[in-house]
Amino acid sequence: AIAGSLSNFFALKENEFVPNPKFIPSYKQEERNYIEAANILKDSGVDLLILEMLLDINHSEILLNAALKTGLPVWVGLSCCESKFDNSIVGRNFRAEKEKSLIYDEEKYKEQPKFLPEDEIIQFEDIIKTLTNIGGDVYGIMHTWFQDSSGGLKIIKDHWKGPMMYYPEIHKFDTSTHEAIAMSTEDEFANSCLEFIDDQIQIIGGCCGVSDTHLKKLIEKF
């Protein structure tokens, strides 16, 4: 099967991990953009749509509704982290991460990195409740470190009884060198993934830092 990818990741400022205000559309234009992109993928012959790295409610529900309009199966991938402020599970947010996933010079870049323009810290359970009430065929966690994943997967299971997927992230990114720093070996990746596979979580992949050798090792051990 061929999957088409859709995301609500915004264009960034040059050399910074901050959405560029010049390219942030209105919600109405954002909706039109998603519908156009989803239909292009459908017309190109994809078998399903995967929504990647959803972090919030407002942008995510617009994207999910646009994807569902195509009539294709929609897999909903979310990203979360355990908040350093109160240990709750929230939509992934650079401010809330206990361990920084982005390495950057704080003297050079004064503005705090952020994924979305609003930079809200949102309870992950609120995101899941909203999106599962809209629809989708598969739900899961992606672009999330192993140590943050278990809480997010549990919340999804509390509100979703359908099939689930899991695509962990295993690297940090150094903005000064533009290099990814792998945080897990192939064996560590495979062993950690195996801990999450169960009757509901059967679709396993990898996000940033995961290579074909990581996935081959997982297949060997499965």
Q: Residues of each region from the PLM?
A:
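Domain-level signal for soluble alpha/beta catalytic cores
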Residues: A1-F222
